[in-house]
């Protein structure tokens, strides 16, 4: 007559919002690099930091990038982005259609609209 104790361990991911904050911080700290070839016909053998402000080799968990991301706030015929200028936005929304986010900090004009329609109401 003995007793048996079982322990089970597992790894879980952090909450999705926490993960988003971590990725956003890593994105903001990302460093631009350029591939360097040892010879003309070989694949790149290492990445060089493009604008070294202070020398710190990126760690395996850091984000690096080769090309800058396009600015979707401005019109860019090369990428096909029409920009956000002149688009309607929702002043009170916190999502992607909200004015603060969509207008990229440029400010926005507000307009008040009135709409009249037939409601077929009976009193």
From Swiss-Prot:
Q: Which UniProt keywords apply?
A: Developmental protein, Disulfide bond, Extracellular matrix, Glycoprotein, Lipoprotein, Secreted, Wnt signaling pathway
Q: Which GO terms describe its cellular component?
A: extracellular space
Q: What protein am I looking at?
A: Protein Wnt-7a
Give the top-rank taxon of the lineage listed in the UniProt record for this protein. Eukaryota
* Family, as annotated: Belongs to the Wnt family.
GO BP terms, alphabetized: animal organ development; canonical Wnt signaling pathway; cell fate commitment; neuron differentiation; positive regulation of JNK cascade
Tell me which residues bear the O-palmitoleoyl serine lipid modification: 1
What quaternary arrangement does the UniProt entry report? Answer: Forms a soluble 1:1 complex with AFM; this prevents oligomerization and is required for prolonged biological activity. The complex with AFM may represent the physiological form in body fluids. Interacts with FZD5. Interacts with PORCN.
Task: Kindly list the GO molecular function terms attached to this UniProt entry.
Answer: cytokine activity; frizzled binding
Disulfide linkages recorded for this protein, renumbered to the chain, are: 89-104
Region Disordered linker: list its residue ranges. Answer: 33-61
Q: Does the keyword Secreted apply?
A: yes
Q: Which organism is it from?
A: Meleagris gallopavo
User: What is the protein's known function?
Assistant: Ligand for members of the frizzled family of seven transmembrane receptors that functions in the canonical Wnt/beta-catenin signaling pathway. Plays an important role in embryonic development, including dorsal versus ventral patterning during limb development, skeleton development and urogenital tract development. Required for central nervous system (CNS) angiogenesis and blood-brain barrier regulation.
Transmembrane residue ranges: none
Q: Which gene encodes it?
A: WNT7A
Modification note: Palmitoleoylation is required for efficient binding to frizzled receptors. Depalmitoleoylation leads to Wnt signaling pathway inhibition.
InterPro entries on file: Wnt (IPR005817), Wnt7 (IPR013300), Wnt_C (IPR043158)
Give me the glycosylation sites of this protein: 90
User: Where is it localised?
Assistant: Secreted, Extracellular space, Extracellular matrix; Secreted
């Amino acid at each position: 007559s003995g007793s048996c104790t079982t322990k089970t361990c597992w790894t879980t991911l952090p909450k999705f919002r926490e993960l988003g904050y971590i990725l956003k911080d890593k994105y903001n700290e990302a460093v631009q690099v350029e591939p360097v070839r040892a010879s003309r016909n070989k694949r790149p053998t290492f990445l060089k930091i493009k604008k070294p402000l202070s020398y710190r080799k990126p760690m395996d968990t850091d984000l690096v990038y080769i090309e800058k991301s396009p600015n979707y706030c401005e019109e860019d015929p090369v990428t096909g982005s029409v920009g956000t200028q002149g688009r309607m936005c929702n002043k009170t929304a916190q999502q992607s259609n909200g004015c603060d986010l969509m207008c990229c900090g440029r400010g926005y004009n507000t307009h008040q609209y009135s709409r009249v329609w037939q409601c077929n109401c009976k009193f």
